[in-house]
Amino acid sequence: MTDREQFFRDVNKIVIKIGTSSITRKGCDHTKENCNIDPAFMESIAAQVYELRKHGKEVILVSSGAIGVGLNELGIAPKPREIPIRQAAAAVGQSILMQDWSRAFSKYGMKVAQILLTYEFYSDRVTYLNLRNSISTLLEYEVVPIINENDCTCTNEIEAIFGDNDKLSAMVASKIDADLLIILSDIDGLFDRNPKTHSDAKLLTLIKKITPEIESYGGDPTNFKGVGGMRTKIKAAKICSMAGCYVVIANSEIEDVVTKILSGEEIGTLFLAERHIQKNRARWIILARASGTVRVDAGAKAAVLGKNSLLPAGIVDIEGTFDRGDVVKLECEGKVFAKGITNYTSKELIKIKGAQTNQIDNILGYNNYDNVIKKENIGILEGIN
């Protein structure tokens, strides 16, 4: 077994970030931004995702390209600096992008879902919780989430905050506890110097730790179409490393590149992760300060310990005042056995405790979630039998 096979053996949740230069890579002038989509490339990605899904892997895509596609559709000259024009292009291009992704995945009987994000998604707790729950639910229904920055509503942030979605993909990967982020672009990986100007540049296949020297290898954007150069990719890898997520930067032109990466082939640059430090999201939940206590019966405790979500039917009592998105203790017969992030406020739980899931709407007048705490948002305390 190769080193990479060993690293990727337990990889289950994968984020694949696809750059603008990959989506439009064939028959396009690289000095321009407005280019047509490459349907063959999209179908190749869909085929590889399909194979991963057959092996039980969960896959999320982060897809760039909306602005470039929109500019081409509207017949606008490349690289306009006016934000309203770029926003309009993003709105037009995003719909085309999703239609083509849907068409590509439909050939393999798969459905896709569009998720557009702004900077707020990782700075606001409730928005972040909504994102996690939405992606988790889509994956449960075997839908492929396709994420992009919401360029249409950004102002000065447009293409600047996330850097052609490099940072966005890293933030998504870290927030949903992904095991691996694959960044596909038109470059082979990280070199010790610029390969365009140095014929003896060496491809670095393994980065164990991102040091100042490694960061110095990041340069300017690789072309005029995307805005994400190697510097932003190194920053993305740094974010993922701290979250316990591996990162591979590879060239999208390699045939079946995703499949080959997961099979252990030494393609591109692999950034190792501090998996022993922060991989377990449950550890953060366990160490977080609880805002209240949810008391449950023995049946609910057994369900939670069996890695199931907490439902309102098993709740006996509520203690404290807390909001949606807060961490709460789970207690049974006087003993705290877990902590979790609640989907409902303390006032709401007082009303729906002991109720069946199908009764929530009648009691509250709405039903935001069938579960009180999703299984992914529960941390079991050590020593619980």
Swiss-Prot record:
PROSITE patterns: GLUTAMATE_5_KINASE, PUA. It comes from the Archaea. InterPro entries: AceGlu_kinase-like_sf, Asp/Glu/Uridylate_kinase, G5K_ProB, Glu/AcGlu_kinase, Glu_5kinase, Glu_5kinase/COase_Synthase, Glutamate_5-kinase_CS, PUA. Residues 291-367 form the PUA domain. ATP binds at residues 17, 185-186. GO terms for cellular component: cytosol. Substrate binds at residues 64, 151, 165. SUPFAM superfamilies: Carbamate kinase-like, PUA domain-like. It is an enzyme of class 2 (transferase). Pathway: Amino-acid biosynthesis; L-proline biosynthesis; L-glutamate 5-semialdehyde from L-glutamate: step 1/2. It is found in: Cytoplasm. Pfam families: AA_kinase (PF00696), PUA (PF01472). One of its GO terms (biological process) is L-proline biosynthetic process. One of its GO terms (molecular function) is glutamate 5-kinase activity. Belongs to the glutamate 5-kinase family. Catalyzes the transfer of a phosphate group to glutamate to form L-glutamate 5-phosphate. This is Glutamate 5-kinase. It comes from Methanosarcina acetivorans (strain ATCC 35395 / DSM 2834 / JCM 12185 / C2A). The lineage of its organism: Archaea, Methanobacteriati, Methanobacteriota, Stenosarchaea group, Methanomicrobia.
